[in-house]
Amino acid sequence: VKAARQPEKRLKLYDMESCPFCKSVREALTALGLDAEIYPCPRGGKRFRQEAKRIGGKEQFPLLVDPNHQVTMYESKAIVDYLFRTYGEMKTPAGYRPGGLRPLAGATGALLRLRRGSAVRAAEAPKQLLELWSFESSPYSRLVRERLTELELPYILHNIGKEQFADMGPAAMRVKPGPYKPKAGGRREQVLAKFG
C-alpha cells in the first residue's frame, strides 16, 4: 500500500483504544499514512462521547468524520473500505479487510493488556490538541495511546508506518544491518529531518 496524499482537512476519529473494531480503522490509517484527529471515548467518558452521539446519532465507535467529503460513518468495515477507496484510490487489500480472526486478535491484545485504555480517568483538558507521531502496531505507542484514551486527551495522530524492510524491528536493533536510512521522500524521513 502506498501512502495517500493528506486531505486538506484532517479526518476525525472518535475511538476507543481497546476496541478491536477501532483498531482496524487505525491500521488502515497507518497503511495509508493518513493523519487524523483522535477523540478518545473510553467507558464512562464525558468529554467526547456526547459529542459523538450528537454528530452521528448514537454512542457507537469507531465514528469517522471526514469534513473533506461531508461524510460521517460508523462500522469499521465501511470506514476501512471508504478510506482505501477515497484516499488510497484502491479496493481494500485483503490484509486490511475486517472480519475473520481480525476482531478476535484485536480483542485478545486488549484482554492481555487488561483492557487498559478502555475506562476513563480524571484529567484536565489540554488547551490544544496534543500530537503523536506513531504507527498502529508499535507496542511503545500503544502504551501512550492507552493513557491518552483513559485521560480523554484529544490528539493529532501523525502516522509514520513502516515504509521499507529497513524499518523493521526496534530502532536500536533493526533487522537490516548498518546505519538506518529512511525511505527517500517518505514520512519517516520528514520526521527525522524535523525532530532528529
Predicted regions and their residues:
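GST-like domain detector, emphasizing the conserved glutathione-binding G-site
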Residues: V1-G196
